Amino acid sequence: MEFKIIAEYFDRLEKISSRLQLTSLLADLFKKTDKNVIDKVVYIIQGKLWPDFLGMPELGIGEKFLIRALSIATSVSDDEIEKMYKSVGDLGQVAFDIKQKQQSASILAFLGAQKASKPLTVEKVYDDLAKVATSTGEGSRDIKIRLLAGLLKDASPLEAKYLVRFVDGRLRVGIGDATILDALAITFGGGQNFRPIVERAYNLRADLGNIAKILANGGIEQLKNIKPQPGIPIRPMLAERLSDPAEMLSKVGNIALVDYKYDGERGQIHKAGDKIFIFSRRLENITNQYPDVAEYISKYVKGNEFIVEGEIIPVDPETGEMRPFQELMHRKRKSDIHEAIKEYPVNVFLFDLMYYEGEDYTVKPLSERRKKLESIVEDNDYVHIATHIITDNVEKLKEFFYQAISEGAEGVMVKSLAPDAIYQAGSRGWLWIKFKRDYQSEMADTVDLVMVGAFHGKGRKGGKYSSFLMAAYNPDKDVFETVCKVASGFTDAELDDLQKKIAELKRDTPHPRVVSTMVPDVWLTPALVAEIIGAEITISPLHTCCKDQYAEGGLSIRFPRFIRWRPDKSPEDATTNREILEMYKSQLKKIEEKPSDQSV
């Protein structure tokens, strides 16, 4: 398959903002895609070479590196390319302009008589970029530059534009996984009504390229039979949120299994024979950070093949008490993991089982999953079943909540024991409800928002970006809707570190998936997720979250404050617009229920 087909579609996709039109055009591209390379095409659309969970190297090509390769490919000096880049602000557009100019000149000089270069294929582009990513050791820099320059030399102007953008991590076509799923269902499944089948398959095996290839070659029937596979992560089940214990019990059917909600790193742990894989909430392979956890699971959880889920918690080695979540960050920074294990020991608290010895447990109710999980974990000091109770009593639920808080947990998770309480991979629903500590605010809980823009500071913070436009995720439209502008809660060190990240993410125009009426000093590609608390949720004409619900404007957080970064969450894992709406309605309900003051 020729790479120019992808480049031409990317050029058309970039000019469209309507999700329906994006989906239709993407489905058209998939119809023209060779079934043998559909997986590679999907990865390229996602802006990657392979799924994150493989732990394979990323391209990691800096702008200087790209400029050098483009210079070699076009015989234009590095200085001239840098000058053009400063003027245009898009290295992909610079590549297009240079190649276009050279192409026009060669046509005039040779009147079309020169021999055309062999067309670039998707296979060639993918394989060479894979070599660029994986090349290491002495001489690897020269190999990378040579490979990249070779591709750019053979590329047409349009191909060069999107090659450079892909390598630079700035594809700009505005397509998320949800839109890809829609297009796959239309192209190979027979229509949008088959989308739930495609999505469930993706939720059970979070490798969209692999799912696309199975669907393209085997059809919708083959996807129906997909089960979890150890080594490929399952997209995690997510919880709704409430602050009224009575309402929680009512939502889950009046009786619940209530777990501690631990303040740790959510880990999905797979065993396949003698291999252990640990995946983060974002489905990244974090096995190397937790070799001790891999050893504990191998030793104390019975079975040859299974997938379990739990929280990895830092603990005090002397008392066994839970330590703050932030201590886990030291494991990521330490070069000597064995030293980190001694300094920051962890325990694992398991709360679910999704697969065991060839059997798909995601389709079984929680009561059956938990019973099996308890039967396979041996008594030990490192791997535990999450502390829990089963109750139908509101007062007992409250008591257990305060017990959890006193022992260092964030709160509790209230889980349905109904016969249909399956593991809803990749979905947020009322089968699980989180009940977290009240932050002494009208907002009953924190929210996780995506940074989509930045504003210059004033006074002491002049010269820095010091306030930030934050957005919630709208899963129905696959877009990010603004909720607030946050400036407080950041330390000076956090702001300094943030300047570097902004430099990598900034863009001149809003990202195609960002819906905003507010215009920041610089737009950002949605990537960073932060935990935010505020005084209350109000309606504001400045913001777009749930703007279709209220004539006066969208929902906004008053007096927002930064709590911490959530590196474990992807932008699509952020708090949804529906959750913000539910929090707002719950807040109104509380206000209405408060007795009014009466004069005597």
From Swiss-Prot:
Q: Which Pfam families match?
A: DNA_ligase_A_C (PF04679), DNA_ligase_A_M (PF01068), DNA_ligase_A_N (PF04675)
Q: Which cofactor does it need?
A: Mg(2+)
Residues bound to ATP: D259, R266, R281, E311, F351, R428, K434
Q: Does the keyword ATP-binding apply?
A: yes
Query: Which InterPro entries does this UniProt record tie to the protein?
Result: ATP-dep_DNA_ligase (IPR050191), DNA_ligae_ATP-dep_bac/arc (IPR022865), DNA_ligase_ATP-dep (IPR000977), DNA_ligase_ATP-dep_C (IPR012309), DNA_ligase_ATP-dep_cent (IPR012310), DNA_ligase_ATP-dep_CS (IPR016059), DNA_ligase_ATP-dep_N (IPR012308), DNA_ligase_N_sf (IPR036599)
What's the domain of life for this entry? Archaea
Tell me yes or no: is DNA-binding among this UniProt entry's keywords: no
UniProt entry keywords in alphabetical sequence? ATP-binding, Cell cycle, Cell division, DNA damage, DNA recombination, DNA repair, DNA replication, Ligase, Magnesium, Metal-binding, Nucleotide-binding
Identify which top EC class this enzyme belongs to: ligase
PANTHER family (UniProt xref) = DNA LIGASE 1, DNA LIGASE 1/3 FAMILY MEMBER
* Function, as annotated: DNA ligase that seals nicks in double-stranded DNA during DNA replication, DNA recombination and DNA repair.
Protein name per the record: DNA ligase
Q: Which organism is it from?
A: Acidianus ambivalens (Desulfurolobus ambivalens)
